Amino acid sequence: TKKSAKTKTKKLTYTLKVAKVGVALSGDSVVAIGSTTKLTNTKKNSSRAKITYTSSDDSIATVAADGTVTGVKAGKATITAKITVGKDSATTTKDVEVKNYVLSTVAQNKLTELTATVTGNTKNLKPTDFVVKNETTNVVYPVSKVSVDSKDASKVTLTLFSELKDAATYDVTLDGITKTFVASDGKVASIGLDNVTIPAATETEVKLVSKDANGVIVKEVSYPSSDSTYDFTIDTKGNGYTS
């Protein structure tokens, strides 16, 4: 008789690793009234992950389903993000402060003029809302005028009473936020005309503009010049060209 074949059985073991659910928020922690900032989760999760956002105080800041936070009134609120994958979940929070204005950038355009990027209801800005101070001497330079761009309300121009041409570092503070810039040294590095193309039969003012090495306007002189420091002439002879 034939011997019966032996049956061999092998046991295979698979280990399935399940990544833990994670959530961490990135985004601005300061937002102006009426403006928005987007919070996003920086942790990688399953495509099945569902994230929800809530605000501790909707009267200060609201948050949409996609993490967009809108400033309502000045104050502080805590945004909570909860991510869920199946039965697993994770939660994190981010504190957000709502201000009347948020100062993002500041730069010098002329010796007595600064340009700033500001969010908020900028049409209500006043010269006294800004503090311009020399970091070394702590001397404050008052702002005489605030102008808001008619097409882009976030572009704000500050006119100062005094020229800043000492190459010093200055602080500009608005609603508790401070940005810095280095002032011009007041040395002329280039000279040119502000308008090099003029429409035919159209009266157009032409200015001689001198700038420092960083492009800050040191001086503007209108033609014809009455300034003893600069002398320039315009030759109107030729075939449509001037020199």
Where are these regions (language model features)?
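Extracytoplasmic soluble-region selector
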Residues: T1-Y101, N121-N124, N134-S150, L164-A167, ...
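A generic structural motif
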Residues: G67-V69, L114-A116, S154-F161
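Beta-strand/beta-sandwich contexts
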Residues: Y101-T115, T204
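Short beta-strand segments enriched for Tyr within beta-sheet-rich domains
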Residues: Y170-V172
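Short acidic/polar inter-strand loop motif in beta-rich domains
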Residues: I177-T180
